[in-house]
Each structure stands twice: as structure tokens, then as C-alpha cells.
């Protein structure tokens, strides 16, 4: 059985406290993503909590602590735009929604590339990425008419969605005007290894 996504509701025991703390942080990192991010804030208890949900089925988690976005908080507003992409450099990516009362349709979409029929990064027999085909697919990353939505995960407060890093995905339906009423979330990236 292959798992492509995992949803964990009520992730933090104290989401309101987490959110209140996050709202006092500096969102000063701008990059190849919509909105702005904090410095990474991945702590041991969060790692253990995610591991508790995944390790039995997927194996031990390996965290790339030096990844600049691992555990970062990010926010976007209605003026932001995104594109369809994959996070193929790791086995898993995660998004934890932290805006209470957010529109449900402002979650994460999983997409299939219409021309190729692929919904995840193409890999060669040795497991490496088929770079030529991936580049062709990524030429269509910003054109939603080239893609079909195959799954939508709703934006529910304190919900962590973990998905296979090879899946083509995008955030959906930005909202709000600022940090306090925009789409606030935390990002995670990691690998799993069976013993």
C-alpha cells in the first residue's frame, strides 16, 4: 500500500498559544514562494509528534535541520499567487494550517498534468528524477489550464497535511490582507527510512 498523503487534525495541543507566539515573530524571509516566512522554528517536541504519527508505517524520520524552511511559519494574503510544483528533494512535505475560521477551499490542491497524465515527479528506474520530462512539465507550472485537480485538502485550523514530496501540488485561494487575517501556516520537509 502506498500512502501519498496523511492528515492529522488537532496537531498542536495549544494551537492558540502557538499562533499568538508566531504572530510576534519576524516574517522577513522572501524567496521563491508566495508571502513571507520566519526563520526555521523546528523543535524536538514537534519532530517527535510528527514521528509518532508516521514512524510505525513509514520508518524513522530523518530531519534536515539545516534546511532553511524546515519548521518555518509563512503567511500569504489575497494578493499573492502560486504555481504548481513538487518538493521532490525529500520524501515528505507538510503544511500545518494556523488561521482560525479560514475558508475551507484555501487549503492544498494535488494536481495531474493533463498532457502527460502524471500527478507526481517522473523518476527513472534507478530512482533519479527524469529531468527532461520534469522540466517539460514545469514549463506549465504557472498555467492552471494545463492541470486537473485530483484532490483537495481543506484548510482546517490546526490541521497538518503531510504529502509525498513528489506530488504536484499548490496552495489554493489566498485570503486576507495581513499577517493576522491571512493564510498562516507552518512548513515541514523530511525523509523516512525503514529499518
Model-derived regions, located:
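Catalytic core of non-heme Fe(II) oxygenases with the double-stranded beta-helix
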Residues: 78-195
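Non-heme Fe(II)/2-oxoglutarate
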Residues: 1-84, 107-108, 114
Amino acid at each position: 500500500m502506498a500512502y501519498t498523503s496523511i492528515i492529522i487534525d488537532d496537531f498542536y495541543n495549544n494551537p492558540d498559544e502557538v499562533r499568538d507566539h508566531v504572530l510576534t515573530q519576524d516574517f522577513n524571509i522572501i524567496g521563491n514562494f508566495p508571502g513571507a516566512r520566519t526563520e526555521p522554528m523546528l523543535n524536538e517536541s514537534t519532530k517527535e509528534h510528527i514521528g509518532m504519527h508516521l514512524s510505525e508505517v513509514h520508518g524513522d524520520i530523518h530531519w534536515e535541520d539545516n534546511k532553511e524552511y524546515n519548521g518555518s511559519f509563512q503567511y500569504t494574503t489575497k494578493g499573492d499567487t502560486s504555481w504548481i510544483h513538487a518538493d521532490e528533494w525529500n520524501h515528505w512535505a507538510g503544511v500545518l494550517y494556523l488561521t482560525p475560521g479560514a475558508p475551507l477551499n484555501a487549503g492544498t490542491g494535488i494536481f495531474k498534468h493533463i498532457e502527460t497524465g502524471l500527478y507526481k515527479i517522473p523518476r527513472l528506474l534507478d530512482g533519479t528524477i527524469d529531468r527532461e520530462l520534469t522540466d517539460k512539465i514545469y514549463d506549465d507550472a504557472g498555467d492552471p489550464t494545463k492541470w486537473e485537480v485530483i484532490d483537495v485538502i481543506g484548510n482546517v485550523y490546526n490541521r497538518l497535511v503531510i504529502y509525498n514530496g513528489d506530488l504536484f501540488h499548490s496552495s489554493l485561494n489566498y485570503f486576507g490582507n495581513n499577517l493576522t487575517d491571512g493564510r498562516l501556516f507552518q512548513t515541514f520537509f523530511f525523509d523516512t527510512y525503514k529499518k
